[in-house]
Amino acid sequence: MELAGKTVLITGASSGIGAACARSFAAARCRMLLVARRRPRLEELAASLRQQRSADVAMAALDVRDRRAVEAWVGGLAEGWRAIDILVNNAGLSRGLEPLHEGDVTDWEEMIDTNLKGLLYVTRAVLPGMVARGAGHVINIGSLAGHETYRGGNVYCATKHAVAGLNRALAIDTLGTGVRVTSVDPGMVETEFSLVRFHGDAGRAAGVYAGLEPLSAEDVAEAVLFCATRPPHANVRELVLLPSAQAGSVHVHRETK
């Protein structure tokens, strides 16, 4: 399906998979709405897309955990930006890897508020317009952690299992409306994910990917673009993308020197 001229909203667009998706959709000549919490990074990304791709880009510093801010921002979009064709729900994070009885409740709340509630707030604000127009595509960035669990992944896995369930339920809710619903569920991707999980411990984060070649953010963005470009009668409901060295959450092959 031709994407040129389509309006794409990407959450968590300031880095990693979100930024890679922005570059991919800009290369496909889409109009970009980019939101994230870190304004300086958004401004840098928007400037590069305008310079390198002559892209039409609008951006906003937005925390998807703030329901009122999300509703106000979507409701206040300028006339030319209100018809959002593709929503990429990318904002998400993991905090900590402790067993549940040692977990930090603040970490739990941040994951639940971002990964699940933030996704719900943005989708609730954008979806009515898609349904009214009889066309649109919601692409949720899920995770292999939405299909499997692993030691210490308790609350993060719970949020991603919730996203997987929501994705399937939303596909039923929108059946017959012309709106497609997709979940792209990557395994190990080398972004800031592990650095955030371990609260800035770069050494521990680097160890996650030692001895293997993980996915890149661009690999995931390519999968997202593939889903978005299927013909209107076809929908990729779930796409699980893993590095070749990974067969599951705990089944990973690492090369040893």
List each language-model region with its residue ranges.
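Conserved glycine-rich cofactor-binding loop
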Residues: S14-S15
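Conserved glycine-rich Rossmann-like NAD(P)H-binding loop of the short-chain dehydrogenase/reductase
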Residues: C30-L45
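The beta1-alpha1 cofactor-binding region of Rossmann-like NAD(H)/NADP(H)-dependent oxidoreductases
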Residues: R39-P40, A61-A72, V105
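Substrate-binding pocket helix/loop in short-chain dehydrogenase/reductase
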Residues: E98-L100, D107-I112
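Active-site helix of classical SDR
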Residues: T123, T159
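Residue(s) in the substrate-gating loop at a strand-loop-helix junction
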Residues: S143
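C-terminal helical subdomain
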Residues: S183-V184, G203-V250
